[in-house]
Amino acid sequence: MSTLHVDIVSAEQAIHSGEAKMLVAPAREGDIGITPRHAPLLTKLRPGEVRVQDENGEERFFYVSGGIIEVQPHKVTVLADTAARARDLDEAAAQEAKRRAEEALANRKAGEDYSHVQAELAEAMAQLQTLERLRRRAKR
């Protein structure tokens, strides 16, 4: 079976580099699945989980806060604003960020711009969902 090379990088560091049978990523318009020989594509990512299935069928999970994904027939590059291995996420910090964002939205004043707070809430929720999916898969 053919594979594709996957690189997941953020501004801070390279998170993953290796061969894969498949990758699933949170594209702006919905999740996308990429397999070898996929048509070229360049699209934005929303906060969420990136799942990489390696040559042996083992899955690895990552969190991205957004960014872009570039797809070529045998190579995928995820350029994330922020990226982390799912197992390295801090659940307590994500819960606290969610609480603060919800509180700020509940106490907002008319005319103030809260788009940054909404973005922070979306990122915290995506981190928590990634952790929850990782826990569910670990129970299998």
Swiss-Prot record:
SUPFAM superfamilies, per database record: Epsilon subunit of F1F0-ATP synthase C-terminal domain, Epsilon subunit of F1F0-ATP synthase N-terminal domain
Topological type in the membrane: Peripheral membrane protein
InterPro entries reported in the protein's UniProt record: ATP_F1_dsu/esu_C_sf, ATP_synth_F1_dsu/esu, ATP_synth_F1_dsu/esu_N, ATP_synth_F1_esu_C, ATPsynth_dsu/esu_N
Record keywords: ATP synthesis, Cell inner membrane, Cell membrane, CF(1), Hydrogen ion transport, Ion transport, Membrane, Transport
MF GO annotations: ATP binding; proton-transporting ATP synthase activity, rotational mechanism
GO CC aspect terms: plasma membrane; proton-transporting ATP synthase complex
HAMAP family: ATP_synth_epsil_bac (MF_00530)
Protein family per UniProt: Belongs to the ATPase epsilon chain family.
Quaternary organization: F-type ATPases have 2 components, CF(1) - the catalytic core - and CF(0) - the membrane proton channel. CF(1) has five subunits: alpha(3), beta(3), gamma(1), delta(1), epsilon(1). CF(0) has three main subunits: a, b and c.
NCBIfam families: ATP_synt_epsi, PRK00571.1-4, PRK13442.1
Entry protein name: ATP synthase epsilon chain
